[in-house]
């Protein structure tokens, strides 16, 4: 599995990207085209199956783009334990707790406050 992180910058009409730790580079007219070229470059450097990517704008003229080659499963790989918890069913276990909390909040009424808001 290979992880390729790129720093992307816009200078006028062109977006450029340089790999954070490596020599891969690309440029394009739009961020979308730049992402496509970076995925192609990373895929050429690493022949494993499965590609995930994440593009995050840092400012209007800069972004961070990450390509993960050889990733297993779906969903975002960024987020560390959150993605692993969701893949293992951790999110499903948390859902009933959230529903219980909502039910508890609904049990409170105006009578508990000692006055009515609409009198």
UniProtKB/Swiss-Prot annotation:
It comes from Oryza sativa subsp. japonica (Rice). Phosphorylated. One of its GO terms (biological process) is translational elongation. Pfam families: Ribosomal_60s (PF00428). Belongs to the eukaryotic ribosomal protein P1/P2 family. Plays an important role in the elongation step of protein synthesis. One of its GO terms (molecular function) is structural constituent of ribosome. Keywords: Phosphoprotein, Ribonucleoprotein, Ribosomal protein. InterPro entries: Ribosomal_P1/P2, RPP3. This is Large ribosomal subunit protein P3. Transmembrane segments: none annotated. It comes from the Eukaryota. The lineage of its organism: Eukaryota, Viridiplantae, Streptophyta, Embryophyta, Tracheophyta. HAMAP family: Ribosomal_L12_arch. Residues 84-95 have a biased composition (Low complexity). One of its GO terms (cellular component) is ribonucleoprotein complex. The keyword Ribonucleoprotein applies. Residues 81-119 are annotated as: Disordered.
């Amino acid at each position: 599995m290979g992880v390729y992180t790129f720093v992307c910058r816009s200078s006028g009409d062109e977006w450029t990207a340089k790999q954070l730790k490596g020599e891969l580079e690309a440029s394009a007219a739009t961020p979308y085209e730049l992402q496509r070229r970076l995925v192609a470059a990373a895929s050429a450097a690493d022949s494993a199956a499965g590609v995930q990517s994440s593009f995050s704008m840092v400012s209007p003229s800069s972004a961070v783009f990450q390509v993960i080659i050889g990733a297993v499963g779906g969903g975002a790989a960024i987020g560390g334990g959150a993605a692993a918890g969701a893949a293992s069913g951790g999110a499903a276990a948390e859902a009933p707790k959230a529903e219980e909390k909502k039910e508890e909040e609904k049990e409170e009424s105006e009578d508990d406050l000692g006055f009515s808001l609409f009198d």
